Each structure stands twice: as structure tokens, then as C-alpha cells.
């Protein structure tokens, strides 16, 4: 019995899409390597909380040109981090203050109303306000400069286009996997193709090494991929 031509056509599309996805991802990685020496570290005065890659503010974390979290050497951040934290965390990813955050901080500093029971206390609070305003203005300048430079480099490198290429390739893989799942299989080779498409979709990646029904299904799919060629040869 011959295999379903629709299934074979969809499988050919999957192989083309997977090749394009791999090449697109390689091209994106190449950009990261090519621009690593040009990509600036955020000024230390803009750094916020540590472990930004693990918390709820990962969207504000310091990243490289393609959006991967950047880990800094904490041993040099003696004024910012306690010795114990530096010992336990040799590297860490930090939140970076955006121009919007810096502008908001500046507005808070400007609207702060100094209060004090004595003239001396009031004078101290006024001086504190002026210092906060000056620091916030400096942070705003730094944040705008950092945003401008990183944006310039992303545009020069064509990062958005490279990411769009990866996204388009992922969509093509998903479309091919869907077409394969909807086509009937007539032979053991067809079963292998369908199982391979399920694996290629990435749906089971999160369940590797875990228990439960999804892990069992993932194991079954891999078994089909392994056994189907033997069945085809035996036939």
C-alpha cells in the first residue's frame, strides 16, 4: 500500500519549514555574537532589583540585543549588593530603569513637600529634595541615552526582521504539523511521520522528565518514531 500523497506533501513542507527555522535561529544567534562587543551595559545608576530574570519584572530586565537575559558579575557591585548576596550569587540579572520610570521618579521628587519640626530639620529635608531631583534628572538623561543607543543598534542589526523570520518559520512548522495531523496515514511510515510532527510541534518539550499522562503520551510518540521504521522494513 502506498502512503497518502497529502501526508507526504505535508511532511515535505514540514522538513522545509524546520530547515528554515533552524537557519533563522542560527542567524539570530549570529546577530547576538556579532554585536556582543558593541552592546552597552546599562549604566549602574539605572540598575534596580536583582534576579530580574526570575521575578515578575522580567520585562524590565537587562537583555542583550536579541532579548536574552544578561547576567552581570556581582563581585564588582560592592556598593549595591551585600557581601553575602554576592557570595551566593556570583552573577545576577538586574531590572533596568526605563525613561518612563525615570520620568515618574523625577515627578515624585519634584512634588515631594519637605516637612520638619525645626528649621534645621526642614532645611535638611529641602536639601534631600534637591538631591533627589538632581539624581532623578541624571537618571532620566542616562535612561534616554541608553534607550537611544540600544534602539539604534537593534535597528542597525535588523533584529526585528530576524525575529520576524524566526516567528514566520515557527508558524510554517505549526501549519505543516497541523496539515500532517489532519491527513490520514496508510502505512507504518505514515504513522512515523505523524508522530514526528507531534514531536516537532514542541508540545511535549515541557513534559520531558516529568510524570503524568502527558509524559506517557510523549514516550508513546517517541516509541512510534523508533518502531515504525522497523515495521516498515519488516513489511
Q: Which positions does each model-derived feature cover?
A:
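Charged, low-complexity eukaryotic segments
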Residues: 4-15, 90-100, 106-149, 153
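Extended alpha-helical coiled-coil "stalk/arm" regions
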Residues: 27-127
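C-terminal or late-domain output modules
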Residues: 1, 162-235
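Surface-exposed polar/charged interaction patches
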Residues: 20, 34, 38-41, 72, ...
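Long, amphipathic, charge-rich alpha-helical segments that form helical bundles/coiled-coils
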Residues: 65-96, 129-136, 140, 145, ...
Amino acid at each position: 500500500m502506498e502512503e497518502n500523497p497529502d501526508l507526504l506533501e505535508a511532511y515535505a513542507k514540514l522538513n522545509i519549514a524546520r530547515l528554515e527555522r533552524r537557519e533563522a535561529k542560527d542567524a539570530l544567534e549570529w546577530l547576538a555574537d556579532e554585536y556582543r562587543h558593541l552592546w552597552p551595559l546599562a549604566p549602574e545608576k539605572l540598575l534596580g532589583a536583582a534576579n530580574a530574570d526570575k521575578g515578575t519584572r522580567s520585562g524590565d530586565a537587562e537583555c542583550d540585543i536579541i532579548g536574552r537575559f544578561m547576567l552581570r558579575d556581582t563581585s564588582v557591585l560592592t556598593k549595591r549588593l551585600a557581601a553575602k548576596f554576592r557570595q551566593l550569587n556570583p552573577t545576577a540579572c538586574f531590572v533596568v530603569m526605563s525613561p518612563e520610570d525615570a520620568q515618574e521618579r523625577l515627578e515624585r521628587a519634584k512634588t515631594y513637600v519637605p516637612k520638619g519640626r525645626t528649621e534645621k530639620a526642614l532645611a535638611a529635608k529641602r536639601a534631600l529634595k534637591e538631591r533627589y531631583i538632581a539624581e532623578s534628572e541624571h537618571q532620566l538623561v542616562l535612561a534616554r541615552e541608553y534607550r537611544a543607543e540600544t534602539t539604534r543598534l537593534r535597528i542597525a542589526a535588523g533584529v526585528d526582521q530576524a525575529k520576524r523570520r524566526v516567528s514566520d518559520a515557527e508558524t510554517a512548522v505549526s501549519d505543516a504539523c497541523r496539515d500532517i495531523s489532519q491527513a490520514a496515514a496508510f502505512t507504518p511510515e505514515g504513522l512515523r511521520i505523524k508522530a514526528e510532527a507531534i514531536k516537532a510541534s514542541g508540545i511535549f518539550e515541557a513534559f520531558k522528565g516529568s510524570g503524568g499522562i502527558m509524559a506517557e503520551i510523549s514516550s508513546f510518540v517517541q516509541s512510534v518514531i523508533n518502531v515504525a521504521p522497523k515495521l516498515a522494513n519488516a513489511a
